[in-house]
Amino acid sequence: MIQTQSYLNVADNSGARKIMCIRVLGTSNPSYASIGDVIIGVVKDASPNMPVKRSDVVRAVVVRTRKALRRNDGMSIRFDDNAAVIINQDNNPRGTRVFGPIARELRDKNFSKIISLAPEVV
């Protein structure tokens, strides 16, 4: 459950390290974002000499949440951190690598490029 003012780690090599959510897009509940939802965020911490700078406004898709996600088969999945991958207007990742495990629900929401870059799909 990601809401406005929530901080997320960035799980790619676009240059940002932490982003803060300022708007939740593309969900039935506009107050909270879950895995696979698109958010708008502002970069709070960034690596130097990278394409994404501090205070840039970016679009991102949530790939991990600490709040447990209930699947249709009854299984519940939860991660150690809240994380997102920065995307462009075409829903393609801006980075070339993705770090950490990614939830399988992203495949259902047509983020197949992120799934293909992920080292582990849970």
Swiss-Prot record:
Protein name: Large ribosomal subunit protein uL14c
Xref: CDD domains: Ribosomal_uL14
Organism (species): Porphyra purpurea
HAMAP family reported for this sequence: Ribosomal_uL14 (MF_01367)
Gene: rpl14
The protein's role, per its UniProt record: Binds to 23S rRNA.
Subunit structure: Part of the 50S ribosomal subunit.
PANTHER family from the UniProt entry: 50S/60S RIBOSOMAL PROTEIN L14/L23, LARGE RIBOSOMAL SUBUNIT PROTEIN UL14M
InterPro entries per UniProt: Ribosomal_uL14, Ribosomal_uL14_bac-type, Ribosomal_uL14_CS, Ribosomal_uL14_sf
Pfam families: Ribosomal_L14
One GO molecular-function entry: large ribosomal subunit rRNA binding
Biological classification of the source: Eukaryota, Rhodophyta, Bangiophyceae, Bangiales, Bangiaceae
SMART domains xref list: Ribosomal_L14 (SM01374)
Localization: Plastid, Chloroplast
Similarity comment: family membership: Belongs to the universal ribosomal protein uL14 family.
Domain of life according to the entry: Eukaryota
NCBIfam families (UniProt xref): rplN_bact
Key words of the record: Chloroplast, Plastid, Ribonucleoprotein, Ribosomal protein, RNA-binding, rRNA-binding
GO cellular component entries: chloroplast; cytosolic large ribosomal subunit
GO biological process, one term: translation
